[in-house]
Amino acid sequence: MVNKEEAQRLKELGNKCFQEGKYEEAVKYFSDAITNDPLDHVLYSNLSGAFASLGRFYEALESANKCISIKKDWPKGYIRKGCAEHGLRQLSNAEKTYLEGLKIDPNNKSLQDALSKVRNENMLENAQLIAHLNNIIENDPQLKSYKEENSNYPHELLNTIKSINSNPMNIRIILSTCHPKISEGVEKFFGFKFTGEGNDAEERQRQQREEEERRKKKEEEERKKKEEEEMKKQNRTPEQIQGDEHKLKGNEFYKQKKFDEALKEYEEAIQINPNDIMYHYNKAAVHIEMKNYDKAVETCLYAIENRYNFKAEFIQVAKLYNRLAISYINMKKYDLAIEAYRKSLVEDNNRATRNALKELERRKEKEEKEAYIDPDKAEEHKNKGNEYFKNNDFPNAKKEYDEAIRRNPNDAKLYSNRAAALTKLIEYPSALEDVMKAIELDPTFVKAYSRKGNLHFFMKDYYKALQAYNKGLELDPNNKECLEGYQRCAFKIDEMSKSEKVDEEQFKKSMADPEIQQIISDPQFQIILQKLNENPNSISEYIKDPKIFNGLQKLIAAGILKVR
């Protein structure tokens, strides 16, 4: 029973304990308060804060999720959730959570500060991880050979290690899906083997024993099934024998595509022996071939309804549900077909039906998306989004652009507009995905290149920004946005290369870039960088070689190489 007054009293006691650092007592008071008012989102937020202060981050995360589920538009809930994920070192998840909160309140200082902090930690952690990983690969001949075979090997290995760090409890599941070379790299990175209970030989023996047991069980099931079938044949009535004769004739007609004749034989079989569910199953198949889908549905439903009178087996009923699903698919009644497949799986959970269900769900989603397309309505939502954008209401602008894209997913301008809204919301990676999609749809769309350049500039990827602006200028040499962006970026690179200060954030980001790592790990470039360090004026020697000059430009733009 809800008692808000008691909940409020307990909350105040919990707050007092929290302020005094008595977090265990605070947890008790907040938990008791929730018992009295289980729909008060603030209580779950306070409980999450108390758990986090005790270092009990899993419980803090659970409470924060409950808070958000009750009140999705309350920014503090996202602060609590992000804090718990931060404590669990789920930095990428924390970043996403803070971004979710900023969608609701873009100017929330606490969310902005938390996002900045977690991003910096994430970049630093990645940089340290990459440096350690590269050192292991370079000093291990086997791993180094894998890198030579596949230049993407370090990146794949890094992603696997990050997955393990985020979900240590799932390490065996993660490794079971990896290529053996990746698993080897993971083991060398962590310094021990993940072999399960016992050694590899014992594990193989255990698997062999299990396989042998499965084989024997399957053989026993098949033997029993044959015995049951034989018993059935010996106990068959004259009606069953006569009914099967008509069924076999119907099957022959069916193979010859003589469906009228086949239908007649199956109906004869049913008339003689109405309790054999498979006669109805065959009859439904004929109706489907004759495109009499209503009759096929009627036949299947009748047989399923009388399954107990027919003493039908589970697998037989599952087959009827599958046939019912096919009938509904042909009638474009996808929801009913999906329901039929799901009921089939209850009777007999097999791979073929699971695959058919997944394929149907994909088909339904695809057709619904296609049916939803309406360029006129897309234009309406785009215009609404533009109005919101002009009024600096960027979350609602994004929502309108989302709907416009659903209505017309092949319009490059819509992705560009949404990228602009996402940029204002500081969701640079998502905005970059949108401009890349816009360019994919229209490679001549200059505005998309200028926005791509701006995003790389904001993300301090100055060389990539220059490339984007340059591509836009190739398409339109007089484009004002690309010209100004290029000049701004070139000035920033020049200023940065001559400055004594180092932009730590940009430096960490650059060192985590696989392209930069490849350049600085190249032996030839290491010699060049050493010479430039001794004599900066020697850079003129390398400008003539396009490959070397291109690499040097990238290092300068990345803030790694200074030119004074």
From Swiss-Prot:
Residues 513-552 form the STI1 domain. It is found in: Cytoplasm. One of its GO terms (cellular component) is cytosol. Residues 197-239 form a coiled coil. The keyword Chaperone applies. Residues 201-233 have a biased composition (Basic and acidic residues). InterPro entries: STI1/HOP_DP (IPR041243), STI1_HS-bd (IPR006636), TPR-like_helical_dom_sf (IPR011990), TPR_2 (IPR013105), TPR_rpt (IPR019734). Keywords: Chaperone, Coiled coil, Cytoplasm, Repeat, TPR repeat. Pfam families: STI1-HOP_DP, TPR_1, TPR_11, TPR_16, TPR_2, TPR_8. TPR repeats lie at residues 7-40, 42-74, 76-108, 243-276, 278-310, 318-351, 378-411, 413-445, 446-479. One of its GO terms (molecular function) is Hsp70 protein binding. Residues 199-247 are annotated as: Disordered. It comes from the Eukaryota. The keyword Coiled coil applies. Monomer. Homodimer. Forms a complex composed of HOP and chaperones HSP70 and HSP90; the interaction is stronger in the absence of ATP. Interacts (via TPR 1, 2, 3, 7, 8 and 9 repeats) with HSP70 (via C-terminus); the interaction is direct and is stronger in the absence of ATP. Interacts (via TPR 4, 5 and 6 repeats) with HSP90 (via C-terminus); the interaction is direct. The TPR repeats form 3 domains; the TPR 1 domain is composed of TPR 1, 2 and 3 repeats, the TPR2A domain of TPR 4, 5 and 6 repeats and TPR2B domain of TPR 7, 8 and 9 repeats. Acts as a co-chaperone and mediates the association of the chaperones HSP70 and HSP90 probably facilitating substrate transfer from HSP70 to HSP90. Stimulates HSP70 ATPase activity and, in contrast, inhibits HSP90 ATPase activity. This is Hsp70-Hsp90 organising protein. It comes from Plasmodium falciparum (isolate 3D7).
